[in-house]
């Protein structure tokens, strides 16, 4: 029976999985969009959603809880100072997972995970130029 099985193992030990999710969450908070494999993206979404919910609370205890999960002081600061306010009116669903084809080396399914209502200025200059060229997300 498949009772009480909540998360994917991702072929890693518990400590490796925990460290990987912390690193990926820090990268997602910093860049607001990352490319990874589909199972990792699906696992990262709820993890980051819970962190943003802590940031919306904005108290010291929430900041300490986020720090214990992310282990990156700069990203926790951005999480609480920027993202908590940005999503104050939204009840959940802070991340979006988009399928992005297959990786050439091993044909692994890839995905883009991004924050909803993300800031395009958080991306690099090359990405901004490409977005403007495609007529996609423009800065307001």
UniProtKB/Swiss-Prot annotation:
Residues 119-133 have a biased composition (Basic and acidic residues). Keywords: Ribonucleoprotein, Ribosomal protein. One of its GO terms (biological process) is translation. GO terms for cellular component: cytosolic large ribosomal subunit. PROSITE patterns: RIBOSOMAL_L17. GO terms for molecular function: structural constituent of ribosome. Residues 119-140 are annotated as: Disordered. It comes from the Bacteria. Part of the 50S ribosomal subunit. Contacts protein L32. Belongs to the bacterial ribosomal protein bL17 family. This is Large ribosomal subunit protein bL17. The lineage of its organism: Bacteria, Pseudomonadati, Pseudomonadota, Alphaproteobacteria, Maricaulales.
């Amino acid at each position: 029976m498949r009772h009480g099985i909540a998360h994917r193992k991702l072929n890693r030990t518990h400590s490796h999985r925990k460290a990987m999710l912390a690193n990926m969450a820090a990268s997602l908070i910093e860049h607001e969009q990352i490319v990874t494999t589909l199972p990792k993206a699906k696992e990262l979404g709820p993890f980051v959603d819970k962190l943003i919910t802590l940031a919306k609370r904005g108290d010291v205890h929430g900041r300490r809880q986020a720090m214990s999960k992310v282990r990156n002081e700069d990203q926790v600061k951005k999480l609480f100072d920027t993202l908590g306010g940005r999503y104050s009116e939204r009840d959940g669903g802070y991340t979006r997972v988009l399928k992005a084809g297959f990786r050439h080396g091993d044909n692994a399914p890839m995905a883009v995970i991004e924050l909803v209502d993300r800031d395009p200025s958080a991306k690099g200059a090359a990405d901004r130029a490409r977005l403007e060229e495609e007529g996609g997300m423009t800065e307001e």
